[in-house]
Amino acid sequence: PNYQFGNKATAYTATEIENYRKLLDDKSSNVFNDDQSLGGYGMGAKIRFPGEDNLNKGSYQDFGDIWLDFSAMGITDDNVQNYRRELNLQTGIASTEFSYKNVSYKREHFVSSPDQVMVTNLSASEKGKLNFSAKMELNNDNLEGKLTFDVRNQTCTIEGKVKDNDLKFRTTMKLLLTGGEITADEKNQVYRIKNADQVTIIMAAETDYKNDYPTYRDKEKNLSNVIDTRINDSSKKSYDELKQTHIEDHQSLFDRVSLDLGEFQTSVPTD
């Protein structure tokens, strides 16, 4: 909140920085004083920082919350078994597994840099066992926006701006089903999935930010076109294709270095 974008037009010059470095190297007692030898800008009261003349540097903001409700299946924290969560550093995929009424359930999550989308996949060991509701909410007082449903395309979109600096944003969630059926409760702004074999949730998000002083805005960017293109292109791929593309991209960097600490136990819990 209260983000003031931009760089100070008059910040440290290369000469000033070099002068400070020399004084630090020489252990000068004047480094932290208002030393006139530095043009009146010692590293004391008159130090000049980049950014605007205030202490508020802004903070990261969330685009919204995605809620998945499995109460229709009777699942609670107390009646599931074999619960396990994992973050696989080698694949860059987070997963959750558990069993309920002799059925094994699995959820996988990753963010794909090549496709510029976040992907969640829900599956079960038996067909027709996925029953839940999904919704997206704008739950951030620093943002203002509106939520729209596109029932035909099974999407939910939030579009708006940051209140303090008018930074525009747009995010879309799309549901892809294998088996089962999906209905839209537009009044409560929620999708209900019934008897599905597998569900893939694709989410894309974007802002009109541009690293270009002094406005830091891309007025030419059409957020609707950018998001729709990402969602449509990703939706044409199977979950396995999206997953494999992500893993290959992740491992192209991750596999450059390996560290062997000897024997280790994979069954030791982190809690």
Specify the residue positions occupied by each region the protein language model found.
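Aromatic-residue-lined binding/catalytic grooves and analogous aromatic/hydrophobic interfacial grooves
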Residues: 1-271
